[in-house]
Amino acid sequence: MKKNNTILYYGCAAQARYASSNHGLLYSPSQAHLFNFSLARTYLNFSNGFRAFSSERKRQNSWKLSVRSIYMDSVNFTKHDFINALLKNFKQGNVYTVLVKVEYLDSSGNRAWCMLNVQKGIIYRNKSDFIELVKEFFDEVYIGYIEYMSRYHAQEVLSIQIMYILNNDSYRQYSLKNINKEKLDKNLVNVKQTKLDFSESLLPLTTNEKFYGKRLTPILDYKKQFVTSLYINGINFIKLVNKKSKDLNQEFINFDSKTRFYRYKLNEIEYIITVSNISKTETVKTIYLMTGFKFKDNILDKELTTKIFSRQIGNTTIEFDGADIINKEIKLKLPIIRLNYKPFTDLNSRIGTFDLETFRDYNSNSAVYALGFSTLSMSKTDKKTSMYYLTKDGNTSHEIIIKCINEMLSSDYRDHIYFTHNLGGYDIIFILHALKLENKIILENKLKGINTIVEDDKKIKVKKKKPISDVNKKSQNKDHYEISTILRDDRILKCVIKVKTPSGYNKITFIDSYNILPDKLDNLAKSFGTEIQKGLFPYEFVKSNTLNYVGITPSIEYYKINNEVISQELYNELIVPQWDLRKQTLHYLERDLLSLLEIINTYNHYVYKRYNVQLTESLTIARLALNIYLKRYLGDNLIPVVLNNSLFTSIKAAYYGGVAEVYRPYGKNLRYYDVNSLYPFVAKNTMPGHECKYIESKKGLKLSELFGFFYCKVTTNNQYLGLLPVHNQGLIMPNGQWYGWYFSEELKFAEVNGYNIEVIKGYQFNKIDNLFSSYVDDLYKIKANSEGSEKLITKFLLNSLLGRFGMSIFKLKTDIVSVEKAKKLAVTNYINSVKAISDTDVLISYNKEISRKLVEEHGLNYIEILNSNSKLDLEKNNSFKDVAVSISAAVTAYARIFMAQTKLDILKNGGNLYYTDTDSIVTDIDLPDNLVGSELGQFKLEFKLKEGFFISAKTYCLILEKEYIKKNKNKDTVIKAKGVFKTSLDVEKFKSLYFNKQDVEAIKSNNKTNYLEGYVNIESGIVKLKHDAYTKRSKIYDNNGLWIDTKPLNYQVSNMLEDTNSKPLNSPNNNDLCALIKYNKPCFDLIKYNKSITDLILYLPTNKAKFINYAQLESMINEAIHESDMRVANHIKMLIYSLTGILYHGKDGTMYIYSPNSKKIYIKYKKNNKWVTFWNIKYHNGYVYIKNKNKFYLYKG
């Protein structure tokens, strides 16, 4: 572990050492494969990026100097190391903003990054308080880490980046003078008011009116129908009431003759309680102050039995048995998704395409050597495209990019939307870097008196002026190219570029076409049947010294498809007598531009003509599908927008994805089945509506009467298939006992199949039938009866709608800001993504709402911060109004039910299961005829297999029967392995993985993106595929030690996994246990307890450390959730996951404590009423070893 100015390396750096080599990083041979391609490259890239900050280069507004980073790996990401890392880098007396970013491999095996939503302000006053704050922060970080990695289906975590900013000066003038402790964050639920409403101080908790005080006798009118007067101390109370009503513009109140009045006194304050009967068992009550002011009205009491009654105040109803609360119900008013209908009278035809080509420069970084664009109007002329080449049109990549952008911004091509395939992952990095560099050059010229103007004749004119004075520098400091972007998940979806001209502003917009057509360009061209198809090009042939190459055609080794060299037959078609790189590049570039343009134009016309929807108004295929659904299919249906934070958090906890499991790792004569449009099919089931109420009962809720999302205790019946998912570093389907949130219909399915479900609380919804039936049926019919582009478009629309409802409710704002502005935002707003694009500019995506919690954590005054942002509109829409997580959670649950029922039927019919993914099953028997076919929701037989190897989720090899080889492009195998090149694997390697239990090597591609320097390098490297990577089920071995089957993991409420039928505990080669220990990191090492979780005693590491049992802990969690304080609830939950000590009582009262940080167990007992450490012991393979006189003895106590 070594500090290098701004970066610390933890974890795997235990094997890594710094030396005076080029990169300063060495690693042991046993770790070489790890460092070769994953962590080492990550560390080295950042090391190079942050390496040298000599004093002459330091600038106060440099982002590189403002943001420091600490890197940790996942295996050693512990609370202990986290605290030490911050202690080593943070200085007492400072204020810091801390963010956490994770680098991981996604479900396709590609490197990706995400910012955890755990941003925190930390004031370092003294060491002890600081450590407590950091402990609490780690708990928040770890929960976010687990949730995000599960949400993004991460296959492997490569590194955790702790980013911190010294923020002593940001908003210093608004700092609070006395802050001695952290304040808890509360959701927007009026907990205090609800407590007050239902307290004895408001109204006695009984329906017996003798406890309401002295009954008063009113005066009635002559017909004895209404009360005219009620004199109290000589004053007519009825007149006071109606005078107050008139003053407050409320209705005149008539009390009928049956109204009863009581004078009630509490804490020296007097009230008047009125009681009116609605029925024999129901009364409504109103409470007035003696001034006539209506303090609380419409209190509805209902007698349920002689002892039990319910009281409703506002939207809350509570049932009481004496003074005990036995049931709660809170009605929630949910907004609904509304259609903002805007009919279009004409198709937006101002569209174009953009693309660029790169090569490796002398620094081995990618640089642009050709680029161009086309528009619909241009494509109809002889010119067709406008393209630039490095050696012909400019001397540098920067120069030709700026020339191209300037032409696009000219009067002929302005106001166009330019589609670029993979804009966010590639092209935009080069564009942004060039524009920011050009802005800097133009500003420097302005200060020298040289002004740059873009004229309508497309030329740039330079006018000499007097140098700008210091007084005018600020007003002249505006960027020449004004840039705005929209980010999502660390990728740019849209980029708008504007320049000021004498006649106003010229603007162009870049949109990533991959997000609305998620497939490779060559595949799209074939499906759309474009006139111009994407060609083949020898990318690796292009180098600095070949840019002007003219000669023979490059050799066949340079022409590849998916990293595989093309056939000789195909290569022969590419040979030409004189091969000119510039001409070939521009020809290839033009084909790409025109091919994509034709695809977009066809797409644009199709959705406009069929649905009257503009393609250009959608940045993603999911948004386009939603626009079509809302416009054509929503009708009178009411879909709720879940904006309430507690409700959103609870339903999000019940939102699980698809299940990918290996059951048997190897088999012969198998069938591979896929479901036809699984999610659209199950979306035709009954869906949650917009009427919602929170319900909770001390006696438990009856599952058969429920529909919605509920928190429950689950106890399984230990069968071969797990039926309910659990988030635990991915999705597992275990046996055991735990608590969790689930969709009611999935709970009913589990209960029918033997699970014991105790429902504790949750959200009851009304039911909507046929919400998506018309949409699904129409699009599936079109898909089934069409081909080419229409079939592909319909497929995308059909499969993309439902996931859109599961988006986060919070809108993000994306800006390019100065470093100082970014630092201020880090103090007040939660950051989603941040990238340095120059020394002084930051591309930042953040939640628009100023966070009171974050502000106060930094020791600032929230109200004064709001006042300092005078243009801020607190009521401005900061949330999406068209997302409904309840829909997405229900759809995915219905899909799991459907797949689980099919798997149970296979087992019931004598079949075996080998592998399953979200919508596919591999088995050794034929499915019944009624389940197989081409209809929606039926299975299709994708392949018959001679053999199948299933090593892990999404890592398998299928050897096909002869009649299915042609269907597979004349290949006899189907290989899949987490994003690696399929050509780097073969059957023999899978045999080594399975039969020989040997790891194998494969090749995968990674993108190294550098916004600051403006390049993206696509690199290939060797990775290891682990033979024992699968840990989502417990493995079963034959007598020869060969893995032959699996069973569910055993999962307990404390998140401790226990393999109850593993090999003998004293076996040194306990593979199951080792796998589970590895699986459960970085949470804690596995400890096996013979006792029930309810017998555990937990050590609570607070300022006043104490021991509590599990029931007390559950009570604390529930109380925090009831009080809508999720921060406290999550913090307590983390004590189960990674607390300082876990312990339980022995027979003699001795406590056994396990410390994950020290990796030791301590036995403590009371001696003179003090807890003391008696023996130092170790834990191995299920046994405790006691250290005595430097030797360890087996402990059997």
Curated annotation (Swiss-Prot):
| Keyword Transferase set for record | yes
Q: Name one GO cellular component term.
A: mitochondrion
Q: Which reaction is this enzyme known to catalyze?
A: DNA(n) + a 2'-deoxyribonucleoside 5'-triphosphate = DNA(n+1) + diphosphate
SUPFAM superfamilies linked to this entry: DNA/RNA polymerases, Ribonuclease H-like
| InterPro entries associated with the record | DNA-dir_DNA_pol_B, DNA-dir_DNA_pol_B_CS, DNA-dir_DNA_pol_B_mt/vir, DNA-dir_DNA_pol_B_mt_lin_plsmd, DNA/RNA_pol_sf, DNA_pol_palm_dom_sf, RNaseH-like_sf, RNaseH_sf
Q: Where are the transmembrane segments?
A: none
Any GO BP annotation: DNA replication
| Subcellular location(s) of the protein | Mitochondrion
Q: According to the UniProt record, which cysteines are disulfide-bonded?
A: none
| A UniProt-annotated Pfam family | DNA_pol_B_2
Which Gene Ontology terms cover its molecular function? DNA binding; DNA-directed DNA polymerase activity; nucleotide binding
The alphabetical list of record keywords is:
DNA replication, DNA-binding, DNA-directed DNA polymerase, Mitochondrion, Nucleotidyltransferase, Plasmid, Transferase
The EC number(s) attached to this protein equal 2.7.7.7
Q: Which family does it belong to?
A: Belongs to the DNA polymerase type-B family.
The remark listed among the other comments is:
This DNA polymerase requires a protein as a primer.
- What this protein is called in its record is Probable DNA polymerase
Phylogenetic classification of the source organism = Eukaryota, Fungi, Dikarya, Ascomycota, Pezizomycotina
